Amino acid sequence: MLTHALIGDEGRTIELGWQGGRRTRFHAMWLRDNALDDKTRSAGNGQRLITILDIPAETRIGAAEIKGGALEVSFVPEGKTVSFPAQWLSANAYDRDELREPGWTGDVIQRWTKATMQNSVPRASYKAAFHGRSVLREWLSAVRTYGFAVMDGLPAESGALCKVSDLFGYIRETNYGRWFEVRAEVNPNNLAYTNLGLQAHTDNPYRDPVPTLQILACVENTVEGGESSVIDGFAVAAALQAENPEGFRLLSSCPARFEYAGSSGVRLQAKRPMIELGPDGELICIRFNNRSLAPVVDVPFADMDAYYAAYRRFAELIEDPDFEVTFKLQPGQAFIVDNTRVMHARKAFSGTGKRWLQGCYADKDGLLSTLAAIEHSFKEAAE
């Protein structure tokens, strides 16, 4: 609840007091640009109807008053009065004293290890998720929070993985096709198409933008071995940062190069750090794929030894069983991973029997959009 509003700096700023003693400040220009009235933002989709050039450069707060659960602000020279709900102001306050350390993640992200996740893998049945919005919300929320989830009860048939992506968005087609087969082949153009074990990795780091989601569905599996593993790259990065801050800095500030040229007519290249931070230091992406790593040429000579030491330690932590959650997919099961965070691996399997998986890519914008829409509808229903 708002307790006071104090205009300062000749109307350029305003200080708000909150019950409990908290105080936040806002700039007049920021408030005017983010006004919630129907002349500034579309009532239908919330998109802004004006540009920054439509707002006078000399905009000031002429008057402000707390009315009920809102702050009413009058702007000059426009003579425009706008109401801001207190809850909205609190949620969008940017006047923060704390400085975040590089590598921070939002509150919605929960890092995990084998100890915390092996016996509590998030999962849902396809039928329940398809027919129940609450089940789908919980499953999508798990992907957002943990970076992966399992789905049971799919048809054990070719193309069933599309049913998973259809729950929230669209398949991202690549040079591998709309989806691709993961089974042993003669003369494969990718090590995934063998019965060899695969080191933990993220997929397609040679693309920019990288596919942000991957789905793997099991059609047939009668082999010995071949278990799937997932590793929380954010948890591993945090462990590296805790023991070797300088190594973390090098892997997050120096770009690596990735490339792929395994198919006729396809040559893919990308240059991004293995540990990618946003401009404000937020940990936003892990790219780790030994098979696709090109020569590292963007690290200063003086730092190359330290870079490789950090790279080696990062790989050692990724291989540490304490970070690995393992499960074996059965026909009709699939799992989804956030390809910007969670690495996946495969144990080697026998040459007898059959192991047939199918994989495809999708993007998080569709998943997060669907989740946000469901959460909004539940919130409206509760009001």
Curated annotation (Swiss-Prot):
GO terms for biological process: carnitine biosynthetic process. Fe cation binds at H201, D203, H344. It catalyses: 4-(trimethylamino)butanoate + 2-oxoglutarate + O2 = carnitine + succinate + CO2. One of its GO terms (cellular component) is cytoplasm. It is found in: Cytoplasm. It holds the Pfam family GBBH-like_N. Its cofactor is Fe(2+); L-ascorbate. It is an enzyme of class 1 (oxidoreductase). Belongs to the gamma-BBH/TMLD family. PANTHER family: GAMMA-BUTYROBETAINE HYDROXYLASE-RELATED (PTHR10696), OXIDOREDUCTASE AIM17-RELATED (PTHR10696:SF25). Catalyzes the formation of L-carnitine from gamma-butyrobetaine. This is Probable gamma-butyrobetaine dioxygenase.
